Amino acid sequence: DILAAFRVTPQPGVPPEEAGAAVAAESSTGTWTTVWTDGLTSLDRYKGRCYHIEPVPGETDQYICYVAYPLDLFEEGSVTNMFTSIVGNVFGFKALRALRLEDLRIPPAYIKTFQGPPHGVQVERDKLNKYGRPLLGCTIKPKLGLSAKNYGRAVYECLRGGLDFTKDDENVNSQPFMRWRDRFLFCAEALYKAQAETGEIKGHYLNATAGTCEEMIKRAVFARELGVPIVMHDYLTGGFTANTSLAHYCRDNGLLLHIHRAMHAVIDRQKNHGIHFRVLAKALRMSGGDHIHSGTVVGKLEGERDITLGFVDLLRDDFIEKDRSRGIYFTQDWVSLPGVIPVASGGIHVWHMPALTEIFGDDSVLQFGGGTLGHPWGNAPGAVANRVALEACVQARNEGRDLAAEGNAIIREASKWSPELAAACEVWKEIKFEFKAVDTLDK
């Protein structure tokens, strides 16, 4: 069975048992009345069952309801169908004040019907010939308004300075000021020039997201013809059907696939209603993607440390034990499905590098947009500053130093022999984003 953990807030007067049963019925075989066609099938075989209910600590009107769904309710290899059933009409149910899907347990039998990520962590490292450290990226800013040629210039400066990747912003598609084909051409020129100068393999996430699946695939085909290593998709706004189609194309044609989670906070940020991001992360691993944005813990975007590390493990590891202290409700076995690299992006700069290296480890992408292009000397020096900071943190970690305790000292030591890093340290020494997270663990 597929197991689901729902956070249920019933209307006043509705007992939790009734609310849990209603969720199970409405998201499987049930409707609001008995119908004569119920007798034409075996409902006991197909109906969802609410098998356990527990109160939420610290809340008087919230319950975690566990529901089991028989596998025959779901089409093989379709995240779209899985979500249509489990989180379809039930979220508008009048008997509930709020409903949130906290976690899913996907059984190996269903996982084996999915291709998953086009390539996975190890294949990506082999393609890029980069080992032993996190990868470095940068989102090109301003996100909208640059011409294709100026956009390509910004890409080149970042890549030659030492970054592994640059990135289209999620809302860069094909606008009047920069059509997609022009952007692809100038970015390809930039990365080939940077590769020739540095001797390193470089990439730019070319956003293939489009208004139709056909147009999206056309853009991915052109990227492959240019010989670039990676394309990008906005998987929530683009949709799971489009994402799975693109992931299959990328597997068949040797392209890596970077995934942006634009629109996720509309769905996952409120603690009592919606879908938790750990579920969206699991769905992405099934649908397919080699990278996905996962929050930073230390930057400008929402993300508590324990919760973030919980779904980072769900993205990367083969087997994850149940651990409620990190928000993981079920043990998950991914069998042979490749892993996804988490991307830390949003309001981060060189002073965050020790914490990011310690939190996310080697199999991650650390992405500095403003933290690269905001350098007072320009894009290339900004890239140099980030690369020097990263190499210093990795070396210190490998020597046994404690990044959490000595992080600032490590950055200061490195800045003594890197003027680019010293300038970056001076610019961002006072920049902090210290706000309390909205989505926290139940205690």
Curated annotation (Swiss-Prot):
Cofactor note: Binds 1 Mg(2+) ion per subunit.
Reactions it catalyzes: 2 (2R)-3-phosphoglycerate + 2 H(+) = D-ribulose 1,5-bisphosphate + CO2 + H2O; D-ribulose 1,5-bisphosphate + O2 = 2-phosphoglycolate + (2R)-3-phosphoglycerate + 2 H(+)
GO CC annotations, alphabetized: chloroplast
Compartment annotation: Plastid, Chloroplast
PTM remark: The disulfide bond which can form in the large chain dimeric partners within the hexadecamer appears to be associated with oxidative stress and protein turnover.
Binding residues annotated for Mg(2+), in chain numbering: K167, D169, E170
UniProt GO BP: photorespiration; reductive pentose-phosphate cycle
Sorted UniProt keywords: Calvin cycle, Carbon dioxide fixation, Chloroplast, Disulfide bond, Lyase, Magnesium, Metal-binding, Monooxygenase, Oxidoreductase, Photorespiration, Photosynthesis, Plastid
Record-marked site positions (Transition state stabilizer): K300
N6-carboxylysine: residues bearing it: K167
Binding positions (substrate): N89, T139, K143, R261, H293, S345
Enzyme nomenclature, EC number: 4.1.1.39
Family matches, as SUPFAM superfamilies: RuBisCo, C-terminal domain, RuBisCO, large subunit, small (N-terminal) domain
InterPro entries: RuBisCO, RuBisCo_large_chain_AS, RuBisCO_lsu_C, RuBisCO_lsu_C_sf, RuBisCO_lsu_fd_N, RuBisCO_lsu_N_sf, RuBisCO_lsuI
Keyword Magnesium applies: yes
Active site: K141 (proton acceptor), H260 (proton acceptor)
Subunit structure: Heterohexadecamer of 8 large chains and 8 small chains; disulfide-linked. The disulfide link is formed within the large subunit homodimers.
Other notes: The basic functional RuBisCO is composed of a large chain homodimer in a 'head-to-tail' conformation. In form I RuBisCO this homodimer is arranged in a barrel-like tetramer with the small subunits forming a tetrameric 'cap' on each end of the 'barrel'.
Family in the record: Belongs to the RuBisCO large chain family. Type I subfamily.
Protein's UniProt name: Ribulose bisphosphate carboxylase large chain
Species of the source: Buddleja davidii
Gene designation: rbcL
